[in-house]
Amino acid sequence: MFDQCRKVFCRYQTYSIENHVKEKEAYQNYSNTKLSWWFRRDMNHGPSGCDDTIDISEYDAYYLDQTASKKNEKVVYLTFDCGYENGYTEQILDILKKEDVPACFFVTQTYIRDNVAIAKRMKEEGHQVGNHTIYHICMPDKSYEEIVQEVNGCAEYMKEATGYAMDPYLRPPCGEYSARTLAITQDLGFKTIFWSMAYMDFDVNNQPGVDFVIDHFNKYHHSGAIILMHNVSSSNAGALEKVIANLKAEGYRFASLNELQ
C-alpha cells in the first residue's frame, strides 16, 4: 500500500527539484502550531461560535455558510466522515435518496479500497465525495511531502478505483490543523471543511441513541449549518429520516458544498 501511495505521490511531482525546494520552504513562514477545531453551541438557533485563532477564510476554509447565516436563510449542509464501514452507510444512502437530500462524504483511501461499490454509489446518486486523507493522519504532525502524498494520493486513488474524480473538499482528520496545513491544502486545490454542529457519535460502543440525535438537531440547528456526522453511527442511521423530516417541516433545504462562497 505504501509503495502504491508513493507512486501516486511521484506522479504529482511535475515541477523541478529546485522549485520543489522553494515551494517546501515557503510553508515554513506559516505557523504549524497544532489546533483542534471547536465550536460553541447556540441554544437560540443562532450561528455557532468557533475557534478564531486563525482567520480560516483566508485559506478557503469554512465551518458555516456565512452568507446564509447573515441572511437567516434556512439552508443546511449534511456531511459524513467515513474512516471505515460499520454497516450503516447504505442505509444512510437509501434515506438520502428517498428524501432527495444531498450530502458530502469525506472518505479515507482505505475506506474507498474496502468499499469501492459504496463510494461509486455516492457519486452515482449525486453526492459529493471529499478527501479525508489516505490513513486519517494528524496533518500538523506531517512533513510537506507527507501531506501532499496523503491528500493527492487519496484523490488519485478515488479516480483510479471508482472512475469518479474526488470533489475539491477536505476535512482534516480529528479536526486537527494549523495555518501551515491550511495553506498547503489550499494550494493543492482543496477547500477545508470544518463544522458548526456535531456531537459524540463516532464511538460505536457508546452511541448517543436515536432520541438524542433527533433532540440535538431540534435544539441546535441553525441557518448555514455545516453538520458533521459519522457513517459508523447506528444512532445517526436510525434518526436521519426523522431529522430530515423535521428540518424540512421548518422550511429548511439541504444544499451541496459547492454553494459555499
Which residues make up each language-model segment?
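N-terminal pre-catalytic segment of deacetylase/amide-hydrolase enzymes
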Residues: 1-79, 85-91, 98, 114, ...
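Active-site beta->alpha N-cap acidic-glycine motif
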Residues: 52-142, 146, 150-159, 164-167, ...
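Divalent metal-coordination and catalytic microenvironments
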Residues: 81, 96, 129, 170-173, ...
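Active-site environment of divalent metal-dependent phosphoester hydrolases
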Residues: 85-88, 113, 136-137, 176-179, ...
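Histidine-centered catalytic micro-motifs
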Residues: 128-135, 175, 229-232
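His/Asp/Glu-enriched short active-site or ligand-binding loop at hydrolase and phosphoryl-transfer sites
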Residues: 176, 181-220, 252-261
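Catalytic grooves of carbohydrate-active enzymes
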Residues: 222-258
